[in-house]
Amino acid sequence: MSCLKLLTSLCAAASLCIGTAQSAEPVKIRVSWIAPITNWAPMLAEKKELARHLGKSYVLEPVRYVGTPQMITALANGELEIANLAFSTLPIAIQNAGMSDLKVIADELQDGVDGYYSQGYMVLADGPIKKVEDLKGKVVATVAAGAAVDVAMRTMLRKHGLEDKRDYAMVEAPLPTMRAMLADKKADLVPLVLPFALDPELRRIARPLFLNRDVVGVTQLLTWTARQPFLDKNRDAMVDFAEDTLRITRWYLDPANRSEVMAISGRVTKQPPERFDWAFTRRDYYHAPDMVPNLDALQTNVAMMKDLGFVTTSIDVKKHADLSIFEAAAKRLK
């Protein structure tokens, strides 16, 4: 009789374990973004039918931020799993915010790659600013101190002998408001990223004073980053997520899907689809195959942060990279 009771207890325990495993919640993966189309997170959400593991091993939650510096706080507070950090905010997160466990896991986009788009820093076409030196005593707009566009602007102005506060004033404004800042003459120079840079209203009144590639050449502008403990704890779910992500990004980059890509772009921006014939073409930022980042370019880029005094020492980028998750996902799709 005691054997029967033991067998019954073992069966019940096994049943409980199976039930617990089956009822395990999918891993929540919150991914940051700033601009639609330019950032992958909102675009992934538009092609959920290609995400075979979505709702099973993980759930996706795109979260919008004003700029990459705010993502550092969210990462530190456990409010974000994947941050699309700029080269400028990566060393700040690692050194200043003390997140030594932060890892680069994938590419989001690169600027200045030969034959692809490079973002512009715009002035009024009929205004007085003809060269960088003309910005002395003027107002320059930025997203946030330490953001990628901010660092590129400061670097270019320094090359021409101009320093913040001493030679020009800097004001902060969200990217969608930059056209109005320029048009209303609240700023003399504004940074513009896609898709805002191709706004027809902007193009009618503005011209680029310089391009990002003029400052530093190829820029590993944005990378996906995550903290190592989260990656270690949720590796299987992350590989599933990476597999779905690569499947979707390949779909967007396929010229055969151009019409639907334009329709999606129009929907997420609430603008006419025909404005987005540039999206995911050579007129766009460069998106690396299988989202493999250019770590050599990134190493060069982060060195600017030390030069500008945002961090005290440079970091070894390769020691803060873990590309194995997306590598494993890419192998699944071959």
What are these language model-derived features?
Residues 5-17:
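Bacterial N-terminal signal peptides
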Residues 24-163, 169-172, 188-194, 218:
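Short, glycine-/small- and polar/acidic-enriched structural segments
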Residues 88, 98, 176-267:
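Pocket-lining segment of extracytoplasmic ligand-binding domains
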Residues 232-312:
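Secondary-structure end/capping motifs
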Residues 302-334:
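Conserved C-terminal helix/tail region of periplasmic/extracytoplasmic solute-binding proteins
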